[in-house]
Design a protein with these regions (language model features):
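Conserved nucleotide-sugar donor-binding catalytic segment
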Residues: 131-219
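Short aromatic/hydrophobic "clamp" motif used to bind/position activated sugar donors
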Residues: 88
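Glycine-rich, basic loop-to-helix element that forms the pyrophosphate-binding segment
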Residues: 66-83
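Acidic helix N-cap motif at the loop->helix transition within catalytic regions
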Residues: 20-23, 48-56
Length: 274
């Protein structure tokens, strides 16, 4: 299959004062063997030399801009608006694709699904592996009760992103809201590529657990019926460890029915004694 029979992928990097890390990200994109790539960089008006690094590779970048924005989701929306690809991928400044052939491997695996999800590998400042994401059997509301999808290892149809865009009133969980809208409520197809796509460097974003909880509850109230929001709150009371264990068990076919029944019973018990 020739390069132009593959879908155009718009790879979007959002950056701000990332002079020490953005070059490895740029190189991991422009050195891909997958040729049908449109690379976009949205910089938030960096003052530390990031722009000079971007200019160094300007001939390899389809579009870039450096200007102030209203936060990361505003910058991501700008990237979506400028994109022409069939799929979009967001790779953060400092992160990098795991190999020069990974985009071709992903598109060889599937370029039909609305959303293609892979694994991300997190390393520390010493390049030691800290964690590796695990893909669930299915992406349903139970999954999103406690976690999300790593957007840096995700390829999303641009038409979906342009339908919803990211909610800039949210500071942490706007991508989580998008997945609820597109997957849980919209029923759009997801293909799981059970291999590492991106290596992620440590960062401090999305670490405010109280803010995450507040924003998630706001999203649920906006999108879902009241009784489902109540279920979410009850499940939160049960504790994260219980739900994580339930999700692990849920991936085992022979006890999935029992897990479903057990969760329903536990929610009812919590409601009675709440």
């Amino acid at each position: 299959m020739s390069a132009y029979n593959y879908p155009l992928i718009s790879v979007i990097t959002v950056s701000y004062n990332a002079v020490l890390t953005i070059e490895q990200t740029i190189l991991s994109v422009i050195n891909q063997t997958y040729l049908n790539i449109e690379y976009i960089i949205i910089d938030g008006g960096s003052t530390d030399g990031t722009v000079n690094v971007i200019k160094k590779y300007a001939d390899k970048i389809a579009y870039w801009v450096s200007e102030s924005d209203k936060g990361i989701y505003d910058a991501m929306n700008k990237g979506i608006a400028y994109s022409h690809g069939e799929y979009c991928n967001f790779i953060n400044a400092g992160d990098k694709f795991c190999s020069s052939s990974i985009l071709k491997q992903v598109m060889d695996f599937n370029h039909v699904a609305d959303i293609i999800v892979g694994q991300d590998l997190h390393v520390n400042e010493h390049n030691k592996i800290v964690s590796r994401s695990v893909l669930p059997r299915r992406y349903n509301l139970l999954h999103f009760y406690i976690t999300t999808i790593p957007h840096q290892s995700c390829f999303i149809r641009a038409s979906l992103l342009k339908k919803y865009y990211y909610d800039t009133s949210l500071k942490i969980v706007s991508d989580w809201k998008f997945y609820l809208q597109s997957i849980v409520l919209g029923g759009h197809s997801v293909a799981a590529y059970n291999n590492v796509i991106v290596i992620c460097n440590p960062r401090g974003a999305s670490s405010d657990n109280n803010r995450i909880k507040e924003e998630r509850e706001k999203v649920l109230k906006d999108l879902l019926q009241a009784y489902i929001v109540n279920d979410y709150q009850c499940l939160s009371c049960l504790g994260e460890e219980f739900i994580e264990n339930a999700l692990f068990l849920f991936n085992n076919h022979w006890i999935r029915f029992l897990v479903k029944k057990g969760l329903a019973i536990m929610v009812k018990i919590v409601r009675i004694f709440k």
